[in-house]
Amino acid sequence: MRPKRESATSNGQTYFVTSNTSERRPFFRHERWANLFLSTLYGYRPERYLLHGFVLMPDHFHVLMTPQASLELAIQCLKGGFSFRAKRELGWKGEVWVAGFSDHRIRDGEDCRIHSAYIARNPVKARLVEQAAHYAYSSANGQFELDSFPLGLKPQIVLDSSGAAEAAPFQNNDKSSFQSNNESAFQGKNDDAQSLK
C-alpha cells in the first residue's frame, strides 16, 4: 500500500511531478493535443505555480514546479483543466489521465540538477530526438519562458560535446539508433489516438 501523500502547502518547496495518460495512450503525438497541453500548463502558471522545467512525452509529462498554494491543487488544475479543454476543444469523450500523480520534493541544487537533466534527456532516451534542444515539447529547447528556481536550487546543467544535457546517474546513456526529429518521432503505427480530432 502506498503511503499517504504529505500535503504540500505554500512552503516554497519545489517538486518534480510525473503523470501518465489513461492506458498510456499517446495523445501527445498529435500536435493539437500537445499544444493544448502547453497552453493549459502556461495558463495556470501565473496563479498556481512557478514553472522551472517540463517535458511532454507522447503518453506522460514531467514538470519541475513550485506550487503557490498546494501541489495537489496545482496538479488538479493542470490535469483537470486540460481534460476539460480536450473534451470541449478536441471532442474527446473518454478519460485523459490516470488518477493521481507521483512527486519528488527537490532537496538541493544537486537534486535539482539531476531532475533538470532527466527532463532534458527524456526525449533523447526515448529516441524521439537525437539532441534535447531539438525536442519541441520540452523546456530544454530554450524556447519557453520559465521561472527562476528558489534560492539554493539553481542547477548547474553540464552539456556534453553534442550539446545534450548531462544525463542523471540513473539514466541510460545509449545514443544509438535515434530518430532525427519530432515529426518522425510522433508517427506511430500503433496509435490509439489516431482517430482524434
Question: Would you name each region that the model predicts?
Answer:
Residues 1-197:
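Short catalytic/metal-binding and nucleic-acid-binding patches
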